[in-house]
Amino acid sequence: MTRDEAKNKIIFALDVDNLKDIDCWAEKLSRKVGMFKVGKELFTSAGPAAVEAVKKHAGEVFLDLKYHDIPNTVAQAMLAAGRLGVKLANLHALGGPEMMEKASQAVRKEFSENERPRLLAVTILTSSTQDTLKAVGIEHPVEEMVVRLAKLAKESGMDGVVASPLEIEAIRAACGPDFLIVTPGVRPSFAAVDDQKRIMTPAEAVKAGADYLVIGRPIAKAADPIQAAELIVDEIVAGVQ
């Protein structure tokens, strides 16, 4: 794997709440990572301008808003995301097949295949444990639920899933080589675990079959964020040779 290929797998999580910080990070890292994640805090604070701020620096955007609502509402939200020009957008697989199908159909109807956003379904959050699932009435093991939701997502027209790195291999086996797998819960060897429960190193995740890695604090909190991003690229390249 080349350094450029490894770099393009990194999605930097913009865990900020204002446009000035977006400009700072996008300018600093646009050549060091493949994409920027705009999540709930940032989008609630800055709105669509957050996406435009990233694109101003030639950055691609993963709009991480995890839609979960009635099918028509989610379909309209995905159309709005597509009009913003984001590369990836997501919803919760637990919203069910009709919700996912409506979103997929709406996006494919309005946009060409090359221009449309790729739609991802969130399976089980990486902060969740077996106890978390039991508390909300889900008795199935985490991995079983993740694979079940991933298969449902594929059948419902999703392009891929967001899932813990520990479930990558099972998802790949169940859903095939062309199904996108985006994984948070990735921590390079030099970083702290923080609040993610089911984790791997970047190299381990890529080797297991991840297409994209969502990484925030290990880069943002580093003394030298640019160097941290480069070290992660080094780890990936060295680990998958």
Swiss-Prot record:
E.C. code: 4.1.1.23
Q: Which PROSITE patterns match?
A: OMPDECASE
Keywords of the record? Decarboxylase, Lyase, Pyrimidine biosynthesis
One annotated Gene Ontology cellular component of this protein? cytosol
Annotated signal sequence is none
Q: Which residues form the active site?
A: 66 (proton donor)
Chain residues that bind substrate: 15, 37, 64-73, 126, 187, 196, 216-217
Q: Which Gene3D superfamilies match?
A: Aldolase class I (3.20.20.70)
Enzyme class at the top of the EC tree: lyase
Pfam families per UniProt: OMPdecase
Q: Name one GO biological process term.
A: 'de novo' pyrimidine nucleobase biosynthetic process
* CDD domains membership: OMP_decarboxylase_like
Q: MF terms per GO, please?
A: orotidine-5'-phosphate decarboxylase activity
Its pathway is:
Pyrimidine metabolism; UMP biosynthesis via de novo pathway; UMP from orotate: step 2/2
Q: Which SMART domains match?
A: OMPdecase (SM00934)
| Coiled coil location | none
Catalytically driven reaction(s): orotidine 5'-phosphate + H(+) = UMP + CO2
Q: What does this protein do?
A: Catalyzes the decarboxylation of orotidine 5'-monophosphate (OMP) to uridine 5'-monophosphate (UMP).
Q: Which HAMAP family match?
A: OMPdecase_type1_B
Concerning its family, UniProt says: Belongs to the OMP decarboxylase family. Type 1 subfamily.
Q: How does it assemble?
A: Homodimer.
- UniProt protein name: Orotidine 5'-phosphate decarboxylase
Origin organism is Trichlorobacter lovleyi (strain ATCC BAA-1151 / DSM 17278 / SZ) (Geobacter lovleyi)
What gene does the UniProt entry assign to this protein? pyrF
